[in-house]
Structure formats: structure tokens, C-alpha cells
């Protein structure tokens, strides 16, 4: 009997100890923060491009003026935050459609508007096309990703550009057919341009804006300031 009592007491004590251990507060698990992975390394922009100007001689640009740009960005997350710094490199092309004859001579570069350009059957489109080598820089802010990995994003930055080529393209009637004329050079188109950028989006789709703090032409050309508004597709 004594042995049975001792055995029952031992079992009771063992169960009590097990119950006490089960009810102890679990040890606090240290939360580890996962480092943000580089993202948005490729960017493709489609933009409406136009010019702020004070020309009062009838010069006008068209709503069909547009641009395209492609960039590779080096995304560097800042420690474990949702902020990153991204320098990059790429190319951009801008086409400014207008209603004028672009002339460059010893006195400078200027636009001579063509009377009744829209109704004139002797002329079709005219544009100034400029190609740039771009160096963009963005400071990026990301929200917490959802279940699919998508997130809201905001990027403020600056883009510096080096002019590669500037070409005037015309389509004029010659006798009974239209002839395309290309004129290269235009040294009065500024060699450098730069300005702030803004990008706001969700997932891989973004709204993009750029405003140049430099003018399209140097001092020998008309005072015109470029700007761009469009969409930006990002990935990887």
C-alpha cells in the first residue's frame, strides 16, 4: 500500500510539473527583418513631351509630340528599410512636332511658322527629334507588399542628359509626291539638360513626370523649356 501511495504521488508530481511547464510564457522569439531586395531595375517610359515657351509669332507644338526612354537602374536598398537609392543609365528619344520651318544660320536658330499649316496641302508633319544619353537618379519609397508581392511606390529624383543627336524632319510636297527631308546638326540645341523627376505607381505600372531646369536651346535659340508626362513600366 505504501508503495502504491508513493507511486501515485510520483505520478501526480510529474503531471503537475508538466502542467506548469506547459503554462509557462513562451520565450520571446526575436523578430528578424528581411533585407529588401533590389527591384524596378528596368524602366520603360512612354511620354507626352512638350515645351513651355513665350513665342508670339504663331509657333505651336502638337499634342502628338512624344518621347520614349529605356533605363537600367542599380537599386540599392538602405539597410532594412523600405527606402532605396537607385542610380542608372539609359537612352531617351523626344520628338517635338510643330508647325514651323526650323532655321539655323549665323545669327542663331529660330522657328518660322508656316501660314495655315494644318490646311496647307504642301506640307505634312514637321518635327525636331533629339536623342539623349541619360543618367537618372531616384530616391525610392515602397509600401509593404501584398500577398501577390505588389506594392505602392514613390520615387523622386533627378535626370541629367547628354545630347547625342538633333535632327529636323520634314515631309514636303515636291511636284506630285511628298519628299522626306532630314537636316542634322543644330548645334544650338543645348548639349546638356537636366531636371527633377517624379514617379508614382503600383506594381509595375507608374505615372511619370519630368521638368527640365535647362532650356532646349542655348542662348542663340528660342527660350523653350521641355517637360514630360506619361507612364513608366518597371520590372525586375
What are these regions (language model features)?
Residues 1-36:
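Cleavable N-terminal export/targeting peptides
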Residues 31, 182-236:
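Predominantly the C-terminal beta-signal and adjacent terminal strand-loop region
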Residues 57-63, 97-108, 112-130, 163-174, ...:
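Extracellular/periplasm-exposed beta-strand and loop segments of Gram-negative cell-envelope proteins
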Residues 38-40, 62-68, 129-135, 150, ...:
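Residues that define the transmembrane beta-barrel architecture of outer-membrane proteins
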Residues 50-71, 188, 217:
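Surface-exposed strand-loop-strand hairpins of Gram-negative outer-membrane beta-barrel proteins
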Residues 70-76, 89-91, 135-141, 156-160, ...:
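Residues on the lipid-exposed face of transmembrane beta-strands in outer-membrane beta-barrel proteins
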Residues 49-51, 92-96, 142, 161-165, ...:
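Structural signature of outer-membrane beta-barrel domains
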Residues 28-40, 77-84, 144-152, 167:
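Short loop/turn motifs that connect adjacent beta-strands in outer-membrane beta-barrel proteins
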